[in-house]
Amino acid sequence: MKKKNTENVRIIALGGVGEIGKNLYVIEIDSDIFVVDAGLMHPENEMLGIDVVIPDISYLIERADRVKAIFLTHGHDENIGGVFYLLNKLSVPVYGTKLTLALLREKLKQYGHNRKTDLREIHSKSVITFESTKVSFFRTIHSIPDSVGVSFKTSLGSIVCTGDFKFDQTPALNQTCDIGEIAKIGNSGVLALLSDSANAERPGYTPSEAAVSGEISDALYNSQNRVIIAVFASNINRIQQVIHAAAQNGRKIAVAGKNLQSVLQLARKLGYIEADDELFISVQDVKKYPKREVAIITAGSQGEPLAALTRMANKAHKQLNIEEGDTVVIASTPIPGQELIYSKTVDLLARAGAQVIFAQKRVHVSGHGSQEELKLMINLLKPKYLIPVNGEYRMQKAHSKIAEETGMKRSDIFLIEKGDVVEFRGQNVKIGDKVPYGNILIDGLGVGDIGNIVLRDRRLLSQDGILIVVITLDKQKKHLVSGPEIITRGFVYVRESEGLIVQATELVRSIVTEATETSNVEWSTLKQAMRDALNQFLYEKTKRKPMIIPIIMEV
């Protein structure tokens, strides 16, 4: 079948710009819609009770019949964590490499996804043909194996999404970046490049993964006690380095965390991690071995490194606690928005008696290319237009300046925000009208049922507590039958504040008595009067503003 000429290309970021995480890019080629990555983001500190955040996907749901496929660049949560929610609304094939799809299957199983899914495995030489485009792939190097970039070939030129990448001359696990294929795509003509901006502010080159192995091995060699190493569960390269270093230093390995255990088992089964069975012991058996002969790898329930460490430092972990003399290696960088938690965790570990090795030593290197690598990608692909993605705005802006240094014109670089549309029609390009965008907050099984008002209420409850006022009125005569009864949680300790509670009770009684003297009292008006009076009274007495909930019952 002859491939028709492309008339219109639209590129939209529903996530992954102005932020780190929840990558979701929409490539529209004529009437066909393709999705590149569908990730999640870990909540910021003020998002109380929220488990994860995903992009608003209403734009895709409203055009479900036009969505042809989802393409995944690699298996990190920031890129596959939102696929479950997309597949609940869309019936489309999902393309990814062997490891990426294996991790996705585990995640779908974890979320209880029971709908039929069409997962199609690809490799770097795969080519998939649609009506108006051919989709091909190229190998990239990142902190997880089986990473690829995606190229959509159209008659206007190729649309290339790099995914997360760096150029590493001494990579872990013998991974290689297909520079030849990237150059080949560049020589065939690239219309637009969506390129990783996460390290655009960092000059030079990102250090090689090989630099980490020595530091981790030194930590295991120098410590006479247990060594606990915290990683992201999905950082398979780092896990392999820890296993190799532990074996070299004669240490048994215990793996703490179900998510981490699951990823490790999967990666070993598929051949991405090599380790002998006799290296591993259970967490329960750690105490049976001399401390000098044990290494513990840990990650949190969401795969993040800090949650489990915090519990260990607070003596709240079910199986392991930090002991005096332990060495803790944090082989990761803070999740954006959780830098304060990172700092507090390091402090907690130090208080618990641990020697903490983290950012000051090279126990972690980034999986993202720095400025010289971003220039190399631009020079290999020679795009007509550049769209910096996967970064906060300042990173996108730094990427733009780097591109100008390579000779690109500022007018050919688009610093887009979420919901922006870059539209190519023939030889013309413009920024089109915004599409719906935003965050969907996930709390347990609830998807999108938590908004700013709920988060505000949670903040109020966490700061000043709650005060509930209960009164009972005669249904006919409208006078007070019982109460007011005041119940507080997280506001004041009642036994030490009896005088305050008595005064508040009398204040409510006087408001109710005055209001019920009129025959046509409105409950909403009465509740608001109680709320206003108590707010003013309690703030004058305590300088606090608890959430006040009046309850009126009739008998």
Curated annotation (Swiss-Prot):
A GO BP entry: mRNA processing
Residues given in the record as Zn(2+) binding sites = 74, 76, 142, 164
Going by the UniProt record, its keywords in alphabetical order are: Cytoplasm, Endonuclease, Exonuclease, Hydrolase, Metal-binding, Nuclease, RNA-binding, rRNA processing, Zinc
The main enzyme category here is: hydrolase
Q: Give the SUPFAM superfamilies listed for this entry.
A: Metallo-hydrolase/oxidoreductase
Q: What is its EC number?
A: 3.1.-.-
Residues holding substrate = 364-368
Q: Which InterPro entries match?
A: Metallo-B-lactamas, RibonucZ/Hydroxyglut_hydro, RMMBL, RNase_J, RNase_J_2, RNase_J_b_CASP, RNase_J_bac, RNase_J_C
* Keyword Protein biosynthesis carried by entry: no
Q: What domain of life does the native source organism fall in?
A: Bacteria
Q: Name one GO cellular component term.
A: cytoplasm
Q: Which cofactor does it need?
A: Zn(2+)
Phenotype of gene-disrupted mutants: Not essential. While depletion/deletion of RNase J1 or J2 has no large impact on global gene expression, a double mutant alters the expression of hundreds of genes.
Q: Where in the cell is it found?
A: Cytoplasm
Tell me the cofactor note: Binds 1 zinc ion per subunit. The inability to bind a second zinc ion may explain its very poor exonuclease activity.
SMART domains in the record, alphabetically? Answer: Lactamase_B
Major site of localization recorded for this protein: cytoplasm
Q: What else is known?
A: Present in about 3000 monomers per cell in mid-log phase.
Q: State whether it acts alone or in a complex, and with which partners, per the record.
A: Unclear whether it forms homodimers or belongs to a larger complex. According to probably does not form homodimers, while shows homodimer formation. Both reports show RNase J1 and J2 interaction, probably as a heterotetramer shows it is a component of a possible RNA degradosome complex composed of rny, rnjA, rnjB, pnp, pfkA and eno, while finds no evidence of an RNA degradosome complex.
Q: Which family does it belong to?
A: Belongs to the metallo-beta-lactamase superfamily. RNA-metabolizing metallo-beta-lactamase-like family. Bacterial RNase J subfamily.
According to its UniProt entry, the function of this protein is described as:
Endonucleolytically cleaves the 5'-leader sequence of certain mRNAs. Endonuclease digestion by the RNase J1/J2 complex occurs at a different site and in some cases more efficiently than J1 or J2 alone. The exonuclease activity of the J1/J2 complex is highly processive on substrates longer than 5 nucleotides, on shorter substrates is distributive. Plays a role in mRNA maturation and stability. Appears to have a limited effect on 16S rRNA maturation, despite its similarity to RNase J1. This subunit alone has very poor 5'-3' exonuclease activity.
Q: Any idea what this protein is called?
A: Ribonuclease J2
Upper lineage: Bacteria, Bacillati, Bacillota, Bacilli, Bacillales
